Amino acid sequence: MASEDPSVSGVSGRYATALFELARDEKVIDAVKADLDKFSAMLVESPELLRLVRSPVFGAEAQTKALGAVLDKAGIAGISANFLKLLAANRRLFVVADVIGAYRALVARFKGEATADVTVAETLSDKNLEALKLALKSVTGKDVTLNINVDPAIIGGLVVKLGSRMVDSSIRTKLNSIKHAMKEAG
């Protein structure tokens, strides 16, 4: 299963696949995804937690103990908590973001959905988000979940990555193309 999707490979893919298969067998795929999404948001919001996850200074025992306290406080329990503690015990907590991404990809594939990473210059309105979802659904034939990243550096337009395909209609890219064309011409 892991070899079918490039986003589900390596160490993180193996861990995500094992978690997905366990969650599927226990019929808790969505609950585990919700827990992982909550943990992912916690990583973004807490520099201390991110340091705990990434730093090689903390030993496996210290990471596991600290992580257990964080998970208890966050209300993350069961398979999700045990899995995250296993990553800490095995000194693999630093790949947790990749594991979460791979797990999301496995869930999407299982549900017949696709996930698109969309980079925009400014936040899209709900109307524009729905229009983009419908446009991508017409291309893929699948329900599409959007991961929106706001990057003002693209100036305008958007960059869409869907599986191995990428469409870059950003103003930054268009300006760079014009710049290169002018250099070659002049």
UniProtKB/Swiss-Prot annotation:
Source organism (scientific name): Rhodopseudomonas palustris (strain BisB5)
Q: Name one Pfam family in it.
A: OSCP
Q: Where is it predominantly found?
A: membrane
Report the locations given in the UniProt record. Answer: Cell inner membrane
InterPro entries per the record? ATP_synth_OSCP/delta_N_sf, ATPase_OSCP/d_CS, ATPase_OSCP/dsu
Q: Which domain of life is it from?
A: Bacteria
Cellular component GO terms, alphabetically? Answer: plasma membrane; proton-transporting ATP synthase complex
**Family, similarity comment:** Belongs to the ATPase delta chain family.
| UniProt entry keywords in alphabetical sequence | ATP synthesis, Cell inner membrane, Cell membrane, CF(1), Hydrogen ion transport, Ion transport, Membrane, Transport
> Among its keywords, does the record have Cell inner membrane?
yes
**Name of this protein:** ATP synthase subunit delta
What exactly does this protein do? F(1)F(0) ATP synthase produces ATP from ADP in the presence of a proton or sodium gradient. F-type ATPases consist of two structural domains, F(1) containing the extramembraneous catalytic core and F(0) containing the membrane proton channel, linked together by a central stalk and a peripheral stalk. During catalysis, ATP synthesis in the catalytic domain of F(1) is coupled via a rotary mechanism of the central stalk subunits to proton translocation.
Quote the gene name from the UniProt entry.
Answer: atpH
